[in-house]
């Protein structure tokens, strides 16, 4: 484990932006980020917390392209975002799933610094 943050009030992309530094960026597989089905249903109805819009206003400067609003969703008890060496990712994912965290997923990779800190794929 090289870094970790809880995904709470600043949403996934807000907290990911806290992990940026002057040497790395992230490629994020947006479709791999676990989303609670009911959150998707509410977002599709336009029911989105005000904090999510504020998070987008802040963090979008770090993000290439248009991100799903749920990636900015303000959480009160979100998941954990963990960074592990790429060579250990599959093993870490297996251990998390074996421990009962079945929604765990590899959601991206760290890369050399690019124009945007967070590049959505």
Where are these regions (language model features)?
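Glycine-/charge-enriched secondary-structure boundary and capping motifs
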Residues: 1-121
């Amino acid at each position: 484990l090289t870094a970790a943050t809880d995904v709470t009030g600043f949403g996934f992309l807000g907290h990911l932006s806290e992990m940026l530094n002057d040497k790395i960026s992230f490629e994020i597989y947006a479709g791999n980020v676990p989303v609670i089905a009911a959150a998707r249903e509410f977002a599709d109805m336009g029911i989105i917390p005000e904090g999510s819009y504020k998070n987008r206003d802040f963090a979008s400067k770090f993000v290439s392209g248009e991100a799903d609003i749920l990636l900015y969703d303000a959480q009160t008890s979100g998941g954990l975002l963990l960074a592990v060496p790429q060579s250990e990712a599959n093993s870490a994912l297996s251990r998390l799933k074996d421990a009962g965290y079945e929604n765990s997923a590899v959601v991206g990779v760290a890369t050399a610094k690019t124009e945007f800190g967070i590049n959505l794929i």
